[in-house]
Structures are given as structure tokens and as C-alpha cells.
Amino acid sequence: MKRFHIALAVADLEASIADYSARLGQPPQALVYGVYAMWRTDNLNFSIRQQPEKAGQLCQLGFEDDIAQGFTSSTDVNGIAWERFSTLEQDLQIIATFGVPVHPAVERDLIRN
């Protein structure tokens, strides 16, 4: 499966989780309290991280692609970071960067260490 990835910085993680959960029609699949949340829909991989000083700014774009080998990142001509990764690679990046997520939307999708 291939999903478009968007990552944003937000001022208030809890308020943003409530807002984006309503907009996406589901709770986040992965949550690291006070720091990070991520939703996976059929076509979208959407994540937010609490960075009040950068609220509303784009962190990166990219693709979650199950056939991706590893985790790659490049910068386009406008200075936007683009990433390509498999679901497993992103899960490992989340754990390494933010910690082990809790409260998945679906128990079978729990990211485990």
C-alpha cells in the first residue's frame, strides 16, 4: 500500500488531536503523549508533533510505501523535506525519535518495541 505523508508542527497537541481526529473521522493510530500523534487512513499518513515555535509549519512530505527499502530523505528545490519509508521503518523511526506510542485506534495495529 502507498500513502501520501504529511507532517505538521502544532502548538497544542491535545487540541490538534481532537481537531484532526474529527476531520479524519478516526483517532490517531499512534500517540506519544505530549509529543506526537499519527493517523493512517487508506490514502494518507498524517502526523503532528508538538512544536509551538513552529506551529502551522510543514515538517515534511513524502510517501509511506510498503515496497520502500529503508528510510530515505531528500530536499526539493523549495527546501521541503521529502521522505520515503515502509510502515515498519516509520514505526521504528517513531520509537527512536519520540518513544513507544500508546492508545492505537486498533489493537492489532499497536506499534511495539
Residue ranges with predicted function:
Residues 16-18, 49, 56, 71, ...:
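Short acidic, gly/pro-rich beta-turn/loop elements at beta-sheet edges
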Residues 25-27, 48-50, 58, 65-68, ...:
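Short, low-complexity, polar/charged sequence segments that are solvent-exposed and flexible
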